[in-house]
Amino acid sequence: MSDPTQKIAVLGAGSWGTALAALVARHGHPTVLWGRDAAMVDAIDRTHENPRYLPGIALPDSLRATTDLQQTIAGASWILVVVPSHAFTETIKLLAPLRPAGAGIAWATKGFEPGSGRFLHEVARDILGPSVPLAVVTGPSFAKEVTLGLPTAITVHGDDAAFAQVVADAMHGPTFRAYTGDDMVGAELGGAMKNVLAVATGVADGMQLGLNARAGLITRGLNEMLRLAAVIGARPETLMGLAGLGDLVLTCTGDLSRNRRLGLALGRGQSLSDAIREIGQVVESVQTADEVMRQAEQHGIELPISNAVRAVLHGEITPEAGLKELLARERKPEYPQTLFT
C-alpha cells in the first residue's frame, strides 16, 4: 500500500510529466513538478492547469510547480524523471548531487541515449552509481486520458523489487493499474521501438492503405521487437505485455500519438519539417529510429520495417518506395524456430 507521507518530485512539465504528477498528487502524495518554462510552470502552480499541453483539464490543487530544481528535490522520497530522451542524461546529471540519501530514481522517458544508443538505465546507473534504486515506468498510456481519469494499465520495471513496488503503489488507484517487473531492458526496448513502428502504421494510414495493412505492420513490428529482444537479453514475455504489445497497439492506432501523427502527415505527402512543426512537441521516433538500427547492425539482425522508417525520416526514400521495398522482400517463415528459445 502506498505511503501518503512520501514526497514525490517529478522532473518535466510536459504532458506526460504533468499527467503523472497529477496522478500521484490525487493519491495524496505531496508532489512538486519541475519545469524550465517559467510562464508555464507559473500557470500550473497558480491556475492548476497546463495550458500548453493539457488545456482545459483541472489539475489537483495540492500539486505544486516550480523552476527551482533544488526546491523540487529537497526531501523527496523518490524522483520521477519525465523528459525527452535527448534531455535525459543532462537531467540525471543535474539531479545527482541534489538527490536525498536513499531516494530512488524512476523515469517515464522512452527512447535511447542519442548518439551512443545506450539504454537509459545504463546511463542512469553510470551517473548515479551502483547503489541507487532505479525503475522505468512504461506501457500504453496517453497523458490526456490519464489526467481525465480514464482506465489505464502500465508497468514498472526495476532492478530493485521493493523500489519498483513503491513506485507502482504510488500510481495505482481506482482507474490506474500499475504492475511490476524486473526486465528493464525489455521494458525500455518496447517503449522505444513502438515509437518507430507507430510512424510506419501512420504512414500506411496516411496513404489510405487500409486496415489489413495496419494490422500487418503492427504484427510484423512486434516480430521486430521480439527479434531484437532475443539478442540483447530482454525477455519475450515483457514484449508480449504492456511494455511491448500494449504500448505498440496504442501508439500505432491512437491519434493522440505524436509518432503516429507524424506518420500520417508523411503518408499524406507533408514534409518532415512541416509535420514536426505542426505537431509542436518532441517526436521521439526521429532520433530513436537511428538508435534502433544501430542496435540491429551491432547484432547483425534485419529489422525491415524499422529500417524503412529510418530511411523515410532521413529523406533517403519516399513512403511509396519504402512500401514497395517491404512488399518485394523475400518470404520467410513467420517466426524463426530459435526466437523463443
Swiss-Prot record:
Enzyme class: oxidoreductase
Cellular component terms per the entry's GO annotation: cytosol
Keyword Ribosomal protein: no
UniProt: NADPH binding residues: 15-16, 36, 110, 143, 258, 282, 284
InterPro entries xrefs: 6-PGluconate_DH-like_C_sf (IPR008927), 6PGD_dom2 (IPR013328), G3P_DH_NAD-dep (IPR006168), G3P_DH_NAD-dep_C (IPR006109), G3P_DH_NAD-dep_N (IPR011128), NAD(P)-bd_dom_sf (IPR036291)
Localization per Swiss-Prot or TrEMBL: Cytoplasm
Binding annotation for sn-glycerol 3-phosphate: 110, 139, 141, 194, 247, 257-259
Keywords: Cytoplasm, Lipid biosynthesis, Lipid metabolism, NAD, NADP, Nucleotide-binding, Oxidoreductase, Phospholipid biosynthesis, Phospholipid metabolism
Record: active site: 194
Protein's job: Catalyzes the reduction of the glycolytic intermediate dihydroxyacetone phosphate (DHAP) to sn-glycerol 3-phosphate (G3P), the key precursor for phospholipid synthesis.
HAMAP family reported for this sequence: NAD_Glyc3P_dehydrog (MF_00394)
Protein name: Glycerol-3-phosphate dehydrogenase [NAD(P)+]
Species of the source: Xanthomonas campestris pv. campestris (strain ATCC 33913 / DSM 3586 / NCPPB 528 / LMG 568 / P 25)
Gene this chain is encoded by: gpsA
